[in-house]
Amino acid sequence: MTDKTSLSYKDAGVDIDAGNALVGRIKGVVKKTRRPEVMGGLGGFGALCALPQKYREPVLVSGTDGVGTKLRLAMDLKRHDTIGIDLVAMCVNDLVVQGAEPLFFLDYYATGKLDVNTASAVISGIAEGCLQSGCSLVGGETAEMPGMYHGEDYDVAGFCVGVVEKSEIIDGSKVSDGDVLIALGSSGPHSNGYSLVRKILEVSGCDPQTTELDGKPLADHLLAPTRIYVKSVLELIEKVDVHAIAHLTGGGFWENIPRVLPDNTQAVIDESSWQWPEVFNWLQTAGNVERHEMYRTFNCGVGMIIALPAPEVDKALALLNANGENAWKIGIIKTSDSEQRVVIE
């Protein structure tokens, strides 16, 4: 009989002990996100969550997203602590535009070789994003897949479920001629346009860690976590008649605003109402990017746009700014049968 080496899962590149160590490391931060509706803890086959009792006719709203190639930049710069906030933001901001309160969040973390410190930093960021948005991190999947990813490269995806009263769903159907558009300032490029960002860095030969912009490294501007608008917007919805909300993500102004406009309406954006944050001026100049392409790729300093009746504007601005948002009037809605749904002038 020929002697053969006894193989283990670890020999194949999967370290179960590292996975267990990660769970032990993150339990504390995950527990801080717990809502009263959540039943059980980490480790079950499925997460249980009751619906909040305040809803008479609750409708569940779900969303899933990633952070695109911003993740590649974060890995290249070895900055993993805020990418989890980005992941949560991309999901919960999509939910709140429909009036939904985020309830719970799950994440998927996949890597070729699990580094407990890196994964812990990412998941701690996810927990922070959940705290900022008031939802519970109820579970996730950490997949160590040798041969699928290069070295310690990783990818993340997020999944969120929220709830809204059926009669209070915001779907844009109430938008009408004369409505005013309010902008909520962004924290930077958020999590969109990073393939172009990375191309600009490559072509310009710029090192984002040594290049200074507004007194801090360019890397700080590019990796600033996506702003989470949930709590401010939910309070606004309670107190103001909001007709529509657009989350400015991939596709920028041209593609996201029309998603919430009824037929025969047009959004007219006043370009003079705000100054682009310096990072967008740098990207446009360094990449020689045309204005139309900037508005199609980046948020250019505007993370959300809210449509509401003109008499509600002052109240809405006061509420939003009191909650720490940078909010201003950015445009109006007018009746139009033009195929151009958004005009920036």
From Swiss-Prot:
Which compartments is it annotated to reside in? Answer: Cytoplasm
- GO terms for biological process? 'de novo' IMP biosynthetic process; adenine biosynthetic process
List the EC numbers from the record: 6.3.3.1
Disulfide bridge positions per record: none
Q: What InterPro entries does the record tag this protein with?
A: PurM-like_C_dom, PurM-like_C_sf, PurM-like_N, PurM-like_N_sf, PurM_cligase
Q: What catalytic activity is recorded?
A: 2-formamido-N(1)-(5-O-phospho-beta-D-ribosyl)acetamidine + ATP = 5-amino-1-(5-phospho-beta-D-ribosyl)imidazole + ADP + phosphate + H(+)
Short name of any one Pfam family annotated for the protein: AIRS_C
Alphabetical keyword list = ATP-binding, Cytoplasm, Ligase, Nucleotide-binding, Purine biosynthesis
Which pathway, metabolic or otherwise, does it act in? Purine metabolism; IMP biosynthesis via de novo pathway; 5-amino-1-(5-phospho-D-ribosyl)imidazole from N(2)-formyl-N(1)-(5-phospho-D-ribosyl)glycinamide: step 2/2
MF terms from GO for this chain are:
ATP binding; phosphoribosylamine-glycine ligase activity; phosphoribosylformylglycinamidine cyclo-ligase activity
Record bears the keyword Magnesium: no
Q: Which domain of life is it from?
A: Bacteria
Q: Name one GO cellular component term.
A: cytosol
Which Gene3D superfamilies does this UniProt record tie to the protein? PurM-like C-terminal domain, PurM-like, N-terminal domain
The Swiss-Prot or TrEMBL record describes its family as follows: Belongs to the AIR synthase family.
Per its record, how is this protein called by name?
Phosphoribosylformylglycinamidine cyclo-ligase
Q: What is the species listed in this Swiss-Prot or TrEMBL entry?
A: Escherichia coli (strain UTI89 / UPEC)
Q: What is the lineage of its organism?
A: Bacteria, Pseudomonadati, Pseudomonadota, Gammaproteobacteria, Enterobacterales
